[in-house]
């Protein structure tokens, strides 16, 4: 580091020590996020030949506001990471300080550091949840939900802001074992048992078909329908990872 001639302590080396000699380093970059310095290493390790046995050959997942993730097998994940009490206290302190003063600048720096901490926490939870989902199924089917549009069409802007829906969707889309259905598939309205279409309001949490009397949790019903639609069209010519309704 320019201007620093003494040795600096480096935290997190235990992440690399477990690989011993089976690791090759390529590049190293020093990153400054405005608060702390980080060393970003690009390296190669031997591929793990372990054959993973997953519980389900295929699952559907429904992203939502009430429950962050609902799986077709009934498993639900409800995650919300809002502003910390420490951040709220710092914001109140900032309001009583003179803009541009030394104390004001110190508080601004603390606020920025707390925001970085919250962002890192959201990223960590999203990474762990996506890893968990990918470890329980060979194929995951999800819908191309327009999460940003939910802010305008619902009164849940704060819940969406505190959720990690965008991170989950983005990370899952990178996997070649995740199938993304077009947003126009009627996964909530359609009854795969009898073919009936039933419109639901946002506060309707139970799907009950008036024709065949099928009754199911709304989100679990949608997740199972994603699997149904995928299996109906997966063998069509030209089908790719993003399946569209034609």
Feature-to-residue mapping (PLM):
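Acidic carboxylate diad motif detector
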Residues: 1-31, 162
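Positively charged, helix-rich recognition surfaces that bind polyanionic ligands
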Residues: 34-246
């Amino acid at each position: 580091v320019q201007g620093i001639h003494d040795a600096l302590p480096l935290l997190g080396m235990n992440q690399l020590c477990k690989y011993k000699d089976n690791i090759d380093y390529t590049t190293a970059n020093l990153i400054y996020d405005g608060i702390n310095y980080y060393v970003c290493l690009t390296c190669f390790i031997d591929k793990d030949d372990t054959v993973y046995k997953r519980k389900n050959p295929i699952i559907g997942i429904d992203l939502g506001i009430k429950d962050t993730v609902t799986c077709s097998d009934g498993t639900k994940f409800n995650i919300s990471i809002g502003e910390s009490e420490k951040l709220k206290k710092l914001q109140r302190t900032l309001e009583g300080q003179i803009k541009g003063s030394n104390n004001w600048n110190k508080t601004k720096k603390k606020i920025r550091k707390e925001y970085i901490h919250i962002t890192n926490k959201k990223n960590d939870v999203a990474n762990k949840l996506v890893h968990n989902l990918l470890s329980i199924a060979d194929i995951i089917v999800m819908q191309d939900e327009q999460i940003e549009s939910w802010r305008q069409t619902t009164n849940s802007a704060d819940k969406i802001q505190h959720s990690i829906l965008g991170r989950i969707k983005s990370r899952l889309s990178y996997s070649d074992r995740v199938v993304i259905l077009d947003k126009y598939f009627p996964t909530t309205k359609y009854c795969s048992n009898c073919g009936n279409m039933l419109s639901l309001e946002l506060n309707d949490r139970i799907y009950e078909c008036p024709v065949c009397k099928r009754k199911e949790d709304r989100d679990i019903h949608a997740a199972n329908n994603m699997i149904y639609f995928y299996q109906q069209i997966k063998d069509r010519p030209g089908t790719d990872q993003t399946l569209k309704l034609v």
